[in-house]
Design a protein with these regions (language model features):
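Alpha-helical multipass membrane-protein architecture
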Residues: 1-567
């Protein structure tokens, strides 16, 4: 990727209409991402969806380049991972009874601090990971290819908004009016919530993630629910309550072991090379490679002042104190590098694991109230989540020839908007549903937050957690997706079953596409083009179903809060 002059190449890429479209989309995607992360315990990358929508709306307003769409979707998707960072950590404090000790301002400061630290870190590491190391960043690469495939236009808008409307109306009928049931095909199995969740969103998640990964997810669900809970209790090894604690501990251990294994296997061996690379980059940099101000010297000053300011803010406003604030700030830079490396090589960003690691490091050096530990995990998770999103966007920009400074500025706009929206949505949800609605087997499973809460308060079964932790590390080294298995073990069975059904639909969809093309007589290039359009159609419809239910869920929460305020 070349780096032409920032001031000239930004023209036509970072535009007023792009900013407006991006900010509006950012509000919707951030709100729906917070809801998805809490409701489903998962948050798929929104970059490809945002890329398709950005180009569609820009084309409605006239001629649009792929570079303008690239910057617009950078703004649009930025808030999603900010919301994820909050949703994967802060609700753990609600589960422990600290809801009244966390205000909207606290959550906004956590989100803003993580956003700014993530932005400053990515300004430093962009050149190394994107230009010099040239890591794959599969999600960013896919977003670039999707933009190219979508450029010709088509039925994207009708497919998207039609599916969003269907899912939204269905959600109102289910959640607001009670016309349709939330669960289907329920069976009374002691200790197991066996049912199909009547949710377009969860079916869509299974479709979007794909059959193979979700098959491992479902295998974990079968192991935890029928292997341990049903099998273990039937054999008289333990009672149902003990079995459920074992399952939660095992699931958490597998997920955390996976996250630590990513750090040990894929990231730490690269740290020395990364540091050498960053040092080499700085010796050859020119002002054209500045992402913040257009001047590298001014960038250095801004990064230094910004870092110091954030350390002071979290020390004072969040009452962490000077030493914990400095530790958090410094280790956040380290973990954003780890996040970038992980996303670049695997497409996975275990941001809540990085938050846990820094939280435990700080807890070893300082005596802080439990609620403050969640703030630390939240700051780090937001920074790492945003860093993963930024670096994927940078990769898409490298493929398309977009100016990285335009993208970084767009990411800053979207990240700050996302911090505001994410904090507001979190407050709306906990106010509307109450803190007791969050946790395992509750309305909002908040799986990652529950892991954080457990690490703070105590693990139900330490031996099973330790076994899962070791197994997670070993499985990752063997190429087995321990994170997906652990997620299946941990989540309620009805969620895993529903996601699995969605992945089966994706399997059938792919087989239908292959069968349809087999006897078409088209050339290889024509088949590839037709298949890409068919896959895009599935992506858009599934994303619309997912987005429609998520957005309506957030709207219903705000309506509930408004009605309660009116008395």
């Amino acid at each position: 990727m070349g780096n032409p002059s920032n001031r000239t190449s930004m023209r036509g890429q970072l535009t007023l209409r792009g900013v407006v479209i991006g900010v509006l989309g950012c509000v919707i995607i951030t709100a729906s991402s917070a809801y998805k992360a809490l409701k489903m315990g998962a948050l798929p990358w929104p970059i490809i969806f945002a890329a398709v929508i950005s180009l569609f709306f820009l084309k409605l307003m006239g001629n649009a380049s792929l570079n303008e769409a690239n910057v617009t979707h950078t703004i649009m998707s930025a808030g999603a991972m900010v919301a994820g960072g909050l949703a994967f950590t802060i609700p753990g404090a609600w589960m422990l009874g600290y809801a009244d000790q966390i205000s909207w301002l606290d959550m906004f400061i956590v989100a803003l601090a993580g956003t700014i630290l993530g932005l400053l870190a990515t300004a430093l590491i962009h050149r190394h990971f994107i230009v010099d190391a040239a890591l794959e960043f599969p999600t960013g690469n896919a977003a670039a290819q999707t933009l190219r495939a979508t450029e010709a236009g088509g039925k994207t808008g009708k497919q998207l908004f039609g599916s969003m409307a269907i899912a939204g109306i269905y959600s109102v009928l289910r959640d607001a009016l009670g016309v349709v049931p939330s669960m289907l095909c329920t069976l009374n199995i002691p200790g197991v919530t066996f049912a199909i969740y009547n949710s377009p969103m969860l079916l869509s998640i299974g479709f979007l993630v794909g059959f193979a990964p979700v098959a491992f997810w479902f295998a974990g669900a079968l192991l935890g629910n029928f292997g341990i809970i049903v099998g273990g209790t039937a054999a008289g090894l333990f009672d149902i309550v003990t079995a459920q604690g074992i399952v939660k501990s095992l699931g958490m251990g597998l997920m955390m072991g996976f996250g630590v294994a990513v750090v040990l296997k894929d990231i730490l061996p690269q740290v020395a090379g990364i540091v050498r690379g960053l040092a080499a980059d700085s010796s050859t940099d020119t002002d054209e490679q500045s992402l913040i101000s257009g001047s590298l010297k001014l960038d250095a000053g801004i990064i230094g002042l910004g870092t110091a300011a954030i350390a002071v803010i979290i020390a004072v406003a969040l009452d962490l104190g000077p030493v914990p604030a400095v530790i958090v700030t410094l280790f956040t830079f380290v973990t954003t590098i780890m996040s970038a490396q992980s996303c670049g090589q695997t497409g996975i960003d275990p941001m809540e694991i990085f938050g846990l690691i820094v939280m435990l490091i700080v807890a070893a050096f300082a005596q802080l109230a439990q609620v403050k530990l969640f703030f630390i995990a939240g700051i780090v998770a937001v920074a790492c989540g945003l860093a993963g999103d930024v670096m994927n966007d940078f990769k898409a920009g490298a493929v398309l020839g977009t100016n990285p400074r335009a993208q970084w500025i767009g990411q800053a706009i979207g990240g700050i908007v996302g911090a505001l929206v994410a904090a507001a949505v979190m407050v709306a949800l906990v106010t509307a549903y109450g803190p007791d609605a969050f946790g395992p087997d509750k309305s909002f499973v908040a799986a990652q937050s529950s892991v954080v809460a457990t690490m703070v308060s105590g693990i139900p079964s330490v031996p099973w957690f330790a076994g899962g932790f070791i197994a997670g590390i070993v499985m990752y080294w063997l190429g087995i997706p321990a994170m997906m298995i652990g997620l299946g073990v941990y989540l309620p069975f009805y969620m895993s079953l529903t996601a699995f059904l969605g992945s089966c639909v994706k399997l059938a969809y792919d087989k239908w596409a292959a069968h349809r093309d087999a006897g078409s007589g088209l050339s290889g290039k024509e088949k590839a083009s037709k298949d890409a359009a068919f896959q895009e159609q599935g992506l858009v419809v599934a994303s619309g179903l997912l987005g429609g239910e998520s957005v309506v869920g957030v709207i219903l929460a705000f309506v509930s809060v408004g009605l309660s305020l009116l008395g």
